[in-house]
Amino acid sequence: MLTGNPVVATNAEQPVGLSGLMVAFLAFCCGAVVANLYYAQPIVELIAPQIGLSSANASLIVSLTQFGYALGLLLLVPLADLMENRRLVVGFTLAASVTLLCAGLTHSPSMFLVLSLLIGLTSVAVQILVPLAAHLAPEASRGRVVGNIMSGLLLGILLSRPLSSLLVEVFGWRGVFYSAAALMAVIALITAVALPRRLPTHKATYAALIGSVFTLARRYPVLRQRSLYQGLLFASFSLFWTLAPIELMRHHGFTQTHVAIFALVGAVGAIAAPIAGRLADAGHGRRGTLVALLLAPVALLFAALPGSGYVWLVVCAVLLDFAVQLNMVLGQREVYALDPHSRARLNAVYMTSIFVGGAVGSLVASPLYEHFGWHLSAVAVALLPALALGLFLSRRADV
């Protein structure tokens, strides 16, 4: 069976445990849902002319999707501390299915941009699933469970691009959106049947709930600091994964298929998630954070060296992905421990900062590359995790 606990008591705030199969299913769901944000990234140049969007505005597709996701994190994810979680997951996933289907059908550039924003807005179910799993997992294994599920999220981010590139060769770009819509419908159906229920005990109006998100951000310095560290790291992650394919195709003779293989190799970095979970459970969160914040700028600087070939880009991809995932899970574990009854809102603050960083990174990537080329751009990208490292070392007493 997918789960041994299909229903959790409506006032359950105590962990009841998750089967290994359920953890694997949640990891798959996280990866599949978050992939919606990135399917368009490698194929925007195919989409834009067919819907009448200028090449100068093509990057808006990706940016609006990520900003929509950040908006959903801030305005929709906190509902998981107020409403029954399974119903929210099913509702948002079905809404994502509809918006993806409409995006595949539309021929209007303005409508496609609106739908891009809505795809991001409705793909927030992943950020309800993660704190739900944290609620259900026992304290002793919570880091491991969250780490395993977050590995699915990072794999979804990394594999969505090569998958999109491969699907577009067979089905065209509209087929990519139709396939994603069908997958969301299937996930909604399975979660409606198999996902454990959780009805929070927190009572408040929606306005008070959203206001409390900002109250939590003010109350917990650890939340602000962890959000800033990971936001800077994810901005560098987004910049790298936007810039590297351009560099590889322009100066290293890579084809779209080669870039897809490059992304697949980079996905090896997802092994950091379960490692991070075990480190957190063992009380080594600070050491793991230091390793992550050191690893990211060093990897980027090696890739920025004059004369560095594509091999260094591959190494950088693996190490950067490892560092980003390691720090994300360690930070998430620490943030969740601040207030067990507010995990969805804490997660909203944490993940909003991350994906705002990612959206800004993807927005400035192309202008940065066109003005400064690969080597100077890579140095600039390395400054972001270096700044996070400096902030971490200066506040050692807090985090």
List where the protein language model places each region:
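Helix-to-loop junctions at the C-terminal end of transmembrane segments
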Residues: 73-84, 272-285, 369
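Helix-loop-helix hairpin linking two adjacent transmembrane segments in secondary transporters
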Residues: 111, 141, 148-195
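Intracellular juxtamembrane helix-capping segments at the cytosolic ends
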Residues: 125-137, 326-339
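Conserved MFS/SLC helix-loop-helix module at the cytosolic interface between two early adjacent transmembrane helices
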Residues: 71-109
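Juxtamembrane intracellular "pre-TM" segments in multi-pass secondary transporters
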Residues: 8-16, 195-228
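Structural signature of the two symmetry-related core transmembrane helices
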Residues: 87-101, 287-302, 382
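C-terminal transmembrane helical hairpin of 12-TM major facilitator-type secondary transporters
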Residues: 286-331
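Cytoplasmic helix-loop-helix junction between adjacent transmembrane helices
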Residues: 115-152
